[in-house]
Swiss-Prot record:
InterPro entries: Pept_tRNA_hydro (IPR001328), Pept_tRNA_hydro_CS (IPR018171), Pept_tRNA_hydro_sf (IPR036416)
Name of the protein this chain belongs to: Peptidyl-tRNA hydrolase
Function according to Swiss-Prot or TrEMBL: Hydrolyzes ribosome-free peptidyl-tRNAs (with 1 or more amino acids incorporated), which drop off the ribosome during protein synthesis, or as a result of ribosome stalling.
Subunit: Monomer.
Length: 190
């Protein structure tokens, strides 16, 4: 029985960042782990990992501990270690270009300026990495982007984001259970 899918949530390690916009990927992996009964309790290749079964498929859940912009330094060695092709990795991350409350699955493509995703693309040597984007919206006029993504969600945004994080975990589970990317995009993109 081989690992068929790696689910990577992007974020920054430590309690200081736990509820920030940039940690939406970590939040989804935590929800997915709870839903699947998987404990992320092993550190390997600079990442917190957990393995489990979904149907007959083994899956690897990953939270890189390298800080966002160096995520590829954890993901690429894990993919090589477990023999997982880039196309079998689902990267979950925040997206400034999607409004809060929006969700978008893509098969691959450019990083769209997301440095954590760009690090993964660079280290894997391909843009053919599926991803699940969580909309966080753009900062208000005059606010620095870095300050914005490293701050916790506002109360108003949290009301929009919480249901989307749950929906993102459902989308990831759908794929882990063997659902097609086309069907997942039709069902979950909004």
């Amino acid at each position: 029985m081989a690992l068929v899918l790696m689910v990577v949530g992007l974020g920054n390690p430590g309690p200081r960042y736990a509820t920030t916009r940039h940690n939406a990927g970590f939040m989804v992996v935590d929800l997915l782990a709870d839903d699947l009964g998987i404990t992320l309790d092993r550190t390997r290749e600079q990442a917190l990992t957990g393995q489990g079964l979904v149907g007959n498929n083994r899956v690897l859940l990953v939270k890189p501990q390298t800080y966002m912009n160096n995520s590829g330094q954890a993901v690429a060695p894990l993919a090589r270690w477990y023999g997982i092709a880039p196309e079998a990795i689902l990267v979950i991350h925040d997206d400034l270009d999607l409004a809060p409350g929006r969700l978008r699955l893509r098969r691959g493509g450019s990083s769209g300026g997301h440095r954590g995703l760009q690090s993964i693309i660079t280290h894997l040597g391909t843009t053919a990495v599926p991803r699940l984007k969580i909309g966080i919206g753009r900062p208000p006029l005059g606010q620095n982007v870095i300050d914005y993504v490293l701050k916790p969600f506002s109360e108003g945004d949290w009301e929009l984001i919480r249901p989307v994080l749950l929906e993102a975990a459902r989308a990831a589970r759908f794929l882990l259970e063997g659902g097609s990317m086309d069907e997942a995009m039709n069902r979950f993109n909004h």
